[in-house]
Protein backbone atom coordinates (compact mmCIF):
# COMPACT_ATOMS: atom_id res chain seq x y z
CA UNK A 1 0.00 0.00 0.00
CA UNK A 2 3.01 2.25 0.51
CA UNK A 3 3.54 2.50 -3.25
CA UNK A 4 -0.09 3.39 -3.91
CA UNK A 5 -0.09 5.91 -1.10
CA UNK A 6 3.05 7.61 -2.41
CA UNK A 7 1.64 7.73 -5.93
CA UNK A 8 -1.66 9.21 -4.87
CA UNK A 9 -0.06 11.77 -2.57
CA UNK A 10 1.95 12.94 -5.55
CA UNK A 11 -1.11 13.10 -7.76
CA UNK A 12 -3.12 14.90 -5.11
CA UNK A 13 -0.66 17.79 -4.94
CA UNK A 14 -2.00 20.04 -7.67
CA UNK A 15 -3.21 24.96 -8.65
CA UNK A 16 -4.86 27.00 -9.02
CA UNK A 17 -7.73 28.23 -8.72
CA UNK A 18 -10.98 26.72 -7.98
CA UNK A 19 -14.55 27.65 -7.21
CA UNK A 20 -14.55 26.48 -3.64
CA UNK A 21 -18.11 26.87 -2.45
CA UNK A 22 -17.11 25.97 1.08
CA UNK A 23 -14.91 29.06 1.18
CA UNK A 24 -17.44 31.49 -0.29
CA UNK A 25 -18.34 32.76 3.16
CA UNK A 26 -14.70 32.95 4.28
CA UNK A 27 -13.34 35.00 1.40
CA UNK A 28 -10.92 36.91 3.68
CA UNK A 29 -9.23 33.73 4.94
CA UNK A 30 -6.40 32.37 2.75
CA UNK A 31 -6.45 28.70 1.78
CA UNK A 32 -3.71 26.39 0.53
CA UNK A 33 -3.69 25.18 -3.07
CA UNK A 34 -1.54 22.24 -4.15
CA UNK A 35 -0.71 21.89 -7.83
CA UNK A 36 0.82 18.80 -9.41
CA UNK A 37 1.81 19.08 -13.05
CA UNK A 38 1.77 15.65 -14.68
CA UNK A 39 2.28 14.56 -18.28
CA UNK A 40 0.13 12.28 -20.37
CA UNK A 41 1.86 9.12 -21.59
CA UNK A 42 1.46 9.55 -25.34
CA UNK A 43 2.42 5.92 -25.96
CA UNK A 44 -0.43 4.58 -23.83
CA UNK A 45 -4.02 4.06 -24.92
CA UNK A 46 -5.69 6.97 -23.17
CA UNK A 47 -9.27 6.34 -24.26
CA UNK A 48 -10.33 5.41 -20.71
CA UNK A 49 -8.31 8.15 -18.97
CA UNK A 50 -11.34 10.31 -18.18
CA UNK A 51 -13.40 7.32 -17.01
CA UNK A 52 -10.58 6.17 -14.72
CA UNK A 53 -10.00 9.60 -13.19
CA UNK A 54 -13.76 10.04 -12.74
CA UNK A 55 -13.92 6.77 -10.81
CA UNK A 56 -11.07 7.88 -8.56
CA UNK A 57 -12.71 11.26 -8.01
CA UNK A 58 -16.09 9.71 -7.15
CA UNK A 59 -14.64 7.15 -4.75
CA UNK A 60 -11.81 9.12 -3.14
CA UNK A 61 -11.40 12.86 -3.76
CA UNK A 62 -15.09 13.74 -3.48
CA UNK A 63 -15.33 11.86 -0.16
CA UNK A 64 -12.25 13.35 1.50
CA UNK A 65 -13.64 16.17 3.66
CA UNK A 66 -10.22 17.78 4.12
CA UNK A 67 -10.09 18.46 0.39
CA UNK A 68 -12.39 21.47 0.05
CA UNK A 69 -11.86 22.02 -3.67
CA UNK A 70 -10.46 20.20 -6.69
CA UNK A 71 -9.90 20.66 -10.41
CA UNK A 72 -8.27 18.74 -13.24
CA UNK A 73 -6.99 20.98 -16.04
CA UNK A 74 -5.93 19.77 -19.46
CA UNK A 75 -3.81 21.46 -22.13
CA UNK A 76 -5.46 23.93 -24.51
CA UNK A 77 -2.78 26.51 -25.32
CA UNK A 78 0.39 25.74 -23.36
CA UNK A 79 3.97 24.84 -24.21
CA UNK A 80 3.40 21.12 -23.63
CA UNK A 81 0.39 19.33 -25.10
CA UNK A 82 0.83 16.42 -22.66
CA UNK A 83 0.34 18.62 -19.60
CA UNK A 84 -2.37 17.71 -17.07
CA UNK A 85 -2.74 19.70 -13.84
CA UNK A 86 -4.24 18.21 -10.69
CA UNK A 87 -5.39 20.92 -8.27
CA UNK A 88 -6.53 20.47 -4.68
CA UNK A 89 -7.53 23.06 -2.05
CA UNK A 90 -7.20 22.78 1.74
CA UNK A 91 -8.08 25.05 4.65
CA UNK A 92 -4.59 24.87 6.13
CA UNK A 93 -1.17 23.23 5.85
CA UNK A 94 -1.96 20.53 8.43
CA UNK A 95 -4.91 19.34 6.36
CA UNK A 96 -2.59 18.72 3.41
CA UNK A 97 -0.65 16.21 5.50
CA UNK A 98 -3.67 14.68 7.25
CA UNK A 99 -5.60 14.16 4.02
CA UNK A 100 -3.11 11.50 2.93
CA UNK A 101 -4.27 9.12 5.67
CA UNK A 102 -7.92 9.72 4.78
CA UNK A 103 -7.16 9.12 1.12
CA UNK A 104 -5.43 5.85 2.01
CA UNK A 105 -8.47 4.67 3.98
CA UNK A 106 -10.86 5.64 1.19
CA UNK A 107 -8.77 3.74 -1.34
CA UNK A 108 -8.91 0.57 0.78
CA UNK A 109 -12.68 0.90 1.15
CA UNK A 110 -13.20 1.54 -2.56
CA UNK A 111 -10.99 -1.39 -3.65
CA UNK A 112 -10.94 -3.82 -0.69
CA UNK A 113 -9.47 -6.60 -2.82
CA UNK A 114 -5.73 -6.02 -3.10
CA UNK A 115 -5.50 -7.57 -6.56
CA UNK A 116 -8.33 -5.38 -7.90
CA UNK A 117 -6.74 -2.34 -6.28
CA UNK A 118 -3.43 -3.06 -8.00
CA UNK A 119 -5.14 -3.46 -11.37
CA UNK A 120 -6.89 -0.09 -11.01
CA UNK A 121 -3.82 1.88 -9.97
CA UNK A 122 -1.58 0.20 -12.53
CA UNK A 123 -4.07 1.34 -15.15
CA UNK A 124 -4.26 4.86 -13.74
CA UNK A 125 -0.48 5.11 -13.55
CA UNK A 126 -0.11 3.94 -17.16
CA UNK A 127 -1.79 7.12 -18.44
CA UNK A 128 1.07 9.31 -17.17
CA UNK A 129 4.78 9.69 -17.81
CA UNK A 130 7.10 8.98 -14.91
CA UNK A 131 7.70 12.62 -14.01
CA UNK A 132 5.82 15.43 -12.29
CA UNK A 133 6.38 18.74 -10.49
CA UNK A 134 4.75 20.01 -7.31
CA UNK A 135 3.90 23.53 -6.19
CA UNK A 136 1.93 24.84 -3.21
CA UNK A 137 0.29 28.27 -3.22
CA UNK A 138 -1.72 30.34 -0.78
CA UNK A 139 -4.74 32.30 -1.98
CA UNK A 140 -4.48 36.11 -1.84
CA UNK A 141 -8.04 37.29 -1.10
CA UNK A 142 -6.89 40.72 0.10
CA UNK A 143 -6.17 41.79 -3.50
CA UNK A 144 -9.66 40.68 -4.55
CA UNK A 145 -11.17 37.44 -5.81
CA UNK A 146 -14.29 36.39 -7.66
CA UNK A 147 -15.99 33.07 -6.92
CA UNK A 148 -17.38 30.99 -9.77
CA UNK A 149 -21.19 30.90 -9.69
CA UNK A 150 -22.36 28.23 -12.09
CA UNK A 151 -23.63 24.66 -12.09
CA UNK A 152 -22.78 24.20 -15.75
CA UNK A 153 -21.23 20.88 -16.73
CA UNK A 154 -19.60 22.37 -19.82
CA UNK A 155 -15.80 22.75 -19.76
CA UNK A 156 -14.59 26.29 -19.10
CA UNK A 157 -11.55 28.14 -20.34
CA UNK A 158 -9.01 28.61 -17.56
CA UNK A 159 -6.41 31.28 -18.33
CA UNK A 160 -3.46 31.18 -15.94
CA UNK A 161 -0.99 34.05 -15.74
CA UNK A 162 2.27 33.48 -13.87
CA UNK A 163 4.11 36.67 -12.92
CA UNK A 164 7.21 37.35 -10.86
CA UNK A 165 7.01 39.68 -7.87
CA UNK A 166 9.72 42.33 -7.69
CA UNK A 167 9.37 42.51 -3.88
CA UNK A 168 8.89 46.26 -4.37
CA UNK A 169 5.82 48.44 -4.74
CA UNK A 170 2.60 48.31 -2.74
CA UNK A 171 -0.12 45.66 -3.03
CA UNK A 172 -2.84 48.27 -2.45
CA UNK A 173 -2.51 49.36 -6.08
CA UNK A 174 -3.24 45.87 -7.36
CA UNK A 175 -6.19 45.61 -5.00
CA UNK A 176 -7.55 48.88 -6.40
CA UNK A 177 -7.04 47.67 -9.98
CA UNK A 178 -8.91 44.44 -9.33
CA UNK A 179 -11.77 46.22 -7.59
CA UNK A 180 -12.19 48.70 -10.45
CA UNK A 181 -11.45 46.41 -13.39
CA UNK A 182 -11.09 42.64 -12.92
CA UNK A 183 -14.02 42.13 -10.56
CA UNK A 184 -16.29 44.38 -12.66
CA UNK A 185 -15.61 42.59 -15.93
CA UNK A 186 -18.71 40.42 -16.57
CA UNK A 187 -16.82 38.17 -19.00
CA UNK A 188 -14.48 37.04 -16.23
CA UNK A 189 -16.61 34.42 -14.46
CA UNK A 190 -14.10 33.78 -11.70
CA UNK A 191 -10.75 35.16 -10.56
CA UNK A 192 -8.32 33.52 -8.14
CA UNK A 193 -4.97 35.12 -7.20
CA UNK A 194 -2.33 32.96 -5.51
CA UNK A 195 1.18 33.41 -4.18
CA UNK A 196 4.00 30.89 -3.88
CA UNK A 197 4.16 29.00 -0.57
CA UNK A 198 6.39 26.04 -1.50
CA UNK A 199 8.13 25.12 -4.73
CA UNK A 200 10.78 26.20 -7.19
CA UNK A 201 10.36 30.01 -7.32
CA UNK A 202 9.46 32.13 -4.29
CA UNK A 203 8.68 35.15 -6.49
CA UNK A 204 5.86 33.44 -8.36
CA UNK A 205 2.42 35.09 -8.35
CA UNK A 206 -0.26 33.08 -10.12
CA UNK A 207 -3.69 34.29 -11.25
CA UNK A 208 -6.46 32.12 -12.68
CA UNK A 209 -9.24 33.67 -14.79
CA UNK A 210 -12.23 31.54 -15.82
CA UNK A 211 -14.26 32.21 -18.98
CA UNK A 212 -17.16 30.53 -20.74
CA UNK A 213 -15.29 30.51 -24.07
CA UNK A 214 -12.13 31.58 -25.89
CA UNK A 215 -14.19 34.31 -27.53
CA UNK A 216 -15.01 35.74 -24.10
CA UNK A 217 -11.34 35.65 -23.12
CA UNK A 218 -10.43 37.68 -26.20
CA UNK A 219 -13.30 40.15 -25.73
CA UNK A 220 -12.47 40.63 -22.06
CA UNK A 221 -9.35 42.61 -22.99
CA UNK A 222 -11.52 45.23 -24.68
CA UNK A 223 -13.79 45.32 -21.64
CA UNK A 224 -10.76 45.79 -19.39
CA UNK A 225 -9.66 48.78 -21.47
CA UNK A 226 -13.14 50.27 -21.19
CA UNK A 227 -13.19 49.81 -17.40
CA UNK A 228 -9.68 51.25 -17.04
CA UNK A 229 -10.65 54.43 -18.89
CA UNK A 230 -13.80 54.73 -16.79
CA UNK A 231 -11.85 54.31 -13.54
CA UNK A 232 -9.04 56.72 -14.51
CA UNK A 233 -10.50 59.04 -17.18
CA UNK A 234 -7.53 61.42 -17.10
CA UNK A 235 -4.52 60.06 -18.96
CA UNK A 236 -2.09 61.60 -16.46
CA UNK A 237 -3.87 59.94 -13.52
CA UNK A 238 -3.98 56.67 -15.42
CA UNK A 239 -0.26 56.77 -16.14
CA UNK A 240 0.59 57.69 -12.56
CA UNK A 241 -1.47 54.79 -11.22
CA UNK A 242 0.01 52.17 -13.53
CA UNK A 243 3.54 53.44 -12.92
CA UNK A 244 3.00 52.62 -9.24
CA UNK A 245 1.21 49.32 -9.85
CA UNK A 246 3.88 48.09 -12.26
CA UNK A 247 6.50 48.34 -9.50
CA UNK A 248 4.94 45.24 -7.89
CA UNK A 249 6.09 42.95 -10.72
CA UNK A 250 9.34 42.37 -12.61
CA UNK A 251 7.57 42.67 -15.98
CA UNK A 252 8.08 38.99 -16.81
CA UNK A 253 5.04 36.74 -17.08
CA UNK A 254 3.89 33.52 -18.72
CA UNK A 255 0.47 32.71 -20.21
CA UNK A 256 -1.21 29.30 -20.06
CA UNK A 257 -4.69 28.27 -21.19
CA UNK A 258 -6.42 25.09 -20.04
CA UNK A 259 -9.77 23.34 -20.16
CA UNK A 260 -11.22 22.12 -16.88
CA UNK A 261 -13.02 18.82 -16.27
CA UNK A 262 -16.32 19.98 -14.71
CA UNK A 263 -17.48 16.52 -13.55
CA UNK A 264 -14.30 16.20 -11.46
CA UNK A 265 -14.74 19.54 -9.76
CA UNK A 266 -15.31 19.92 -6.03
Model-predicted regions and their roles:
Residues 1-29:
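Bacterial Sec-dependent N-terminal signal peptides
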